[in-house]
Design a protein with these regions (language model features):
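Surface-exposed helix-capping loop/turn segments at secondary-structure junctions
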Residues: 23-27, 115-120, 206-207, 228-231
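C-terminal effector-binding regulatory domain of bacterial HTH transcription factors
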Residues: 208-242
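Short linear motifs at protein or domain termini
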Residues: 1-103, 231-232, 238-242
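Short helix-capping and inter-helix turn/linker motifs at the boundaries of alpha-helical repeat units
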Residues: 185-188
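A broad structural signal for alpha-helix termini and local helix breaks/kinks
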Residues: 40, 157-158, 228
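Conserved amphipathic alpha-helical segments that form helical-bundle/coiled-coil interaction surfaces
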Residues: 98-179, 190-196, 208-222
């Protein structure tokens, strides 16, 4: 049996439940402190601990000063990336762990995207392909656009867990990308296979999309192992930036 949850965490859970119940959206202010103290039946210190915890989780922004207070935010994959990096540091796991996970996950994600993507999702992928080609000579832009393609495919799978998990994995592998460069031919090949994956998804061909994604991630991993083995072998360290 686990330890009982602290009162502040229980209150934090109730605050999130109340946000959902009221249908609060990003930018909404929560009730003032005196009303929250009365509603949750706790002391000021406990309530503020709950709010600080939710701020760390990306649920709230605590705006100081008159007219401030807790404001609803949209959590993102950064918090998950920070938590995963902390867990993986304690396991002394190398960055190659992330590439192994991507190799296992992304073919399935591409197959799901083929069946579930909508017109808006296809348009976002097409725009990403255009930008990647347009900014091919810019190393930083190429890397960002390339990772963004995979994020878009993950969210197009219709599975929010895959979306957030991939956001986190993408954020973690970015930490290993420091110093990693891609020659012009490698960037062109990436554009080509991204375009082929997009075509398979647009055609509703799940088998081809899955096969192409598997080949793409395997080839990318082989390139990193050959050219940047030390980066992949480096242990993951806790990254609060996510």
């Amino acid at each position: 049996m686990g330890r009982p949850k602290k009162t502040a965490l229980l209150v934090a859970q109730q605050i999130v439940e109340d946000i959902s119940r009221r249908g609060n959206t990003v930018g909404d202010r929560l009730p003032p402190e005196h009303l929250m103290l009365e509603h949750y039946g706790v002391g000021r210190g406990t309530l503020r601990e709950s709010l600080r915890y939710l701020e760390l989780q990306g649920v709230l922004m605590l705006k100081p000063g008159p007219g401030g207070g807790p404001i609803v935010q949209q959590p993102d994959g950064g918090t998950l990336a920070a938590t995963l990096s902390l867990l993986l540091q304690f396991e002394n796991a190398p960055f190659s762990t992330i590439m192994e996970a991507r190799t296992a996950l992304e073919p399935t994600i591409a197959r799901l995207a083929t069946a579930r993507i909508d017109d808006a999702g296809l348009a976002r992928l097409a725009e990403n392909l255009r930008l990647t080609r347009e900014q091919l000579t810019d190393q930083a832009a190429f890397s960002a656009n390339s990772e963004r393609f995979h994020e878009l495919v993950a969210w197009s799978s219709g599975n929010a867990l895959f979306g957030y998990l991939f956001d986190a994995l993408s954020g973690l592998i970015a930490g290993a990308s420091m110093g990693i460069t891609y020659p012009r031919r490698q960037r062109e090949l990436t554009c080509e296979i991204h375009e082929e994956i997009y075509a398979a998804i647009a055609d509703g061909d799940g088998d081809t999309a899955s096969h192409l994604m598997s080949a793409h991630i395997t080839e990318h991993t082989t390139y990193l192992e050959k050219r940047f083995h030390k980066a992949l072998a480096r242990p993951i360290r806790w990254d609060l930036d996510g």
